[in-house]
Amino acid sequence: TPRVLIDVMVRLMQPKYGEVIQDPAAGTAGFLISASHYMQEQKDVFELNELDYERFKNSTFYGMEHVQDTHRLGVMNMILHGLDGENDSAGLIYGDTLSPKGQTLPQSDLILTNPPFGSKKGGGLPTRDDFTYATSNKQLAFLQHIYRHLKPGGRAAVVLPDNVLFEGNIGRSIRQDLMHK
């Protein structure tokens, strides 16, 4: 995802200290790092009290990436930007968000993501049992993950191709379901 687009999306969403921020298709963790930078521009992390600093470092940023080499780059990127918390469930997890492992990501105040385009690798369906609609369309599957993992009042900024707006059948059902949330 182009850095300019990431930064614009983060600025529009205005992440705040104390929020849980997630990227279910994290790649090299660009959205998570940009959110951290934005938050630190608003208030220096070293001005936080000890409890808030620990929460920022260990319980704010969550992501998942299923391409192993990309995951390694993302973990290194987070470490280089000081987001190497001590909480094993936080940070960048290696796994497929569209599998049951994706259900382990926390309910979030803010989700920022650019899910991969196309059908799930091998044409298989996501193996999540919490999705209402079975689809091999990755964007529609990620959309279901996103609105299931937002806390009440949560916000999301997502890069999606325009076909998601016009997809018939399952796509229409997912959009209607989203509008009723």
Residue ranges and their predicted role:
Residues L150-A156:
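Short glycine-dipeptide loop
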